[in-house]
Amino acid sequence: VDPTQGMTTDTANNYKSKKREAEDEIQKAQQIINNGDATEQQITNETNRVNQAINAINKAKNDLRADKSQLENAYNQLIQNVDTNGKKPASIQQYQAARQAIETQYNNAKSEAHQILENSNPSVNEVAQALQKVEAVQLKVNDAIHILQNKENNSALVTAKNQLQQSVNDQPLTTGMTQDSINNYEAKRNEAQSAIRNAEAVINNGDATAKQISDEKSKVEQAL
């Protein structure tokens, strides 16, 4: 089994380097062993170098660290704040209900990932398990986010309503006018005020559909 599997690039490269050095030292030691003319000094020196290589590869093996970068990225994505500004209120309620349903799984995955990330020397298996849990709950979080719907654009209705309000505010002088024309003006003014109230209700309704907004805009323009 390759001990560098799932380890950080730096610690894995360090281990591989020390392993190559140890393998080179084994070959040199074998040459000394096979050399019947080797002196005691040569044997002692090679023994020391072999021991140094053993210590170096053991240290490199102990220094191997599980690569947590994937887990860290997944964790950071999981804890991102979900912006519900500009979303339809009904869809926000549905989103919150969906999040509530996975709250325990979410908290467990988040907590475990945080513990592993804080741990200076977790096993590769621990990192992999934590990542698996984070990715599993992230799919459910994504499903919940997809429930959110943007509010429809009502800016054209707001503009039309403001124009109608301006028309209502600009009251003409009725002095010297016939009663019929005054009555007609008052009736139209009441209709306009009613249209303004209806328009405001649609504007204030975050769940209003594009058709409701469009229909209300037409009514306001008729009242203009």
Where are these regions (language model features)?
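Amphipathic, heptad-repeat alpha-helical segments
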Residues: 1-33, 61-117, 147-203
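Charged, amphipathic alpha-helical scaffolding segments
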Residues: 23-63, 110-149, 196-224
